[in-house]
Amino acid sequence: MTQETKPRALNRLKSMYELRAEVDRMYEGGVEASEEGKPVAWVMLEGWSNAILNAMGVKTVFPENYSSLCAAQGMAEPFMERSEAEGWPSHLCGYARASVGYSARMVDLDGKIPPEAPGGGMPKPTLLVASGETCDARFKWFQSLGRFFDAPVWTLESPSPGIRERLSSETYERNVQFLIKELKAFVAFLENLLGKKMDWDMLEFTGGGTNEINRLRWEINELRKSRPGPMHTRDFWSVMTAALFRGAADPEVIIEGHQKMYDEVAERVEKGIAGINRPEKYRMAFEGLPPWHTLGFLDQLAERGWNFVIESAYRPMRPRTIDLSMYDDPMERYVRRRYRSLEESLQEEYEPDEVEIIRNEIIRDGISSRLGLKHISDYQVDGVVLHVLLTCRATSAGLNLLQRRILDVLKVPSLVIEGDIIDASAFNAAEALRKAEAFEETMDHYRKVRKELGMPW
C-alpha cells in the first residue's frame, strides 16, 4: 500500500520558474559581453538608468540583486567576512558589504570572477551607476566599489521633496524638469565614455517595455486580492528580479513571461486555488525587505495556514495613461510616461472623500495616517510582518510608526521580526516562529474587533 506524500506548503506558480531563469541569463549575458569586450555596468536600482544603458548597448548587472542571490544560495558569508577584513562595519547595508567583499576577491584575482561566485558571477565593470535616493549608503557605496576597479562612477539624483510640497503642481513640474536635465546629462556622459550616440528609437523600445512589464505586474497583483490568495509573496519576490533587475534582457521575453503568469494566476482565481497547499487561515502582508538567506521561513509559516498575499517592497505602481503626443523631446516622453504627481496618485488610489481627508491631513500635519495603508485594506489582511533590519535604516526606521498606524486606522496587528537581508547570523528563525505562533491569538482577537466595528473583513 502506497503512502500519500503531503505536498509542500507553498503552491508555487509554474510560470515563476521561466521568469526566474531570465535572471540567470542576465548574469550569463554580462559575462559574455565582458568576454567579447563589450561594456558592462554595475547598477544600483533606481528606476531610470537601465533602459538608457540598454539603449546604448551596455549590459547591466545589479550588485544589490547579486548579493541577494549569494545569500539565497548560502554563499554570501565569505564575501561579508572579506568586507569586514577590508574595514567595513558589520552594521553597513548587507547588499553593500557582500558586493564590497566580492569586489575585493576580484582584485585578488586580477579582475577575474571568483571561482566560488554563484550564478556565474558579475564581470569587471566598465562603469558604475549609483543613486542618490533611499539607501543610506547611496553613492558612497558605488564610489567605494569604483576604487577597486578604477572605473568611472555616475550618480543619478532624483528629487525627493516632502509630502506637503509634493501636493503642489509647481513642485511636480520642477521635478520633471530636474529629471529630464539629470538624465540628459547621464546620456551625454555615456556618449563621451562609449564614443557613440544615443539611439533614441531604442530608448522608446526599452522604456516602453519597462512600462508594459509594470502594467502586467500591477494587474497580477490586482488578482491577488482574491480569496484564497492565488499567489504567495515568495513567487512575487522570485519574479520581481526579472522585471526590476532584468539587465539587457529582451523586454518582449519578460512581457511574455508575465503574461503567462497573469493567465496562470487568473486561472487560480477562477478555480479558487491558493498560493499555499494548506487552508488559508491568515492573510498576511510582509513589510520591509526579504530575508533572502532564510526564505524557507515562509514555508514554515505556510504550514500554519499563513498566506502572504501582498508585500511592500518592489510593489509595482498603477499603470499610467497619458497623452505624450504634445512632447517632441524623447527624454521628456520617457520621464513623463513614468513620473506621476502625488495628486494624481491620490485621485487614482482613493475615493474622493478620502482624498480630501488625506489632502487636509498633509497640509495640516505634513503627513497623513492613511498613506501607506491602502494595500492592507485592499487585500484584507489579518496581520502584518514587519522585518526590521539593523543594516537598513531606510526601510526600517518608519516601521514602528507604521505598526501603530495600521492598528489605529485598520485594527490590524503587526509582528516585528528582527533580521537582515543578507547576513543569516542576524536572523533567528526558531525564535521568529515561536513569536508567530503566539501572534495568531492576537490576529484572532482583532478579527473580532473589526467585525464588531462593521469593517469589511
What kind of feature is each model-predicted range?
Residues G94-R105, E182-E204, R336-D365, T442-W457:
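Extended, charge-rich low-complexity interaction segments
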Residues N400-W457:
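Peripheral docking tails and interdomain loops at the edges
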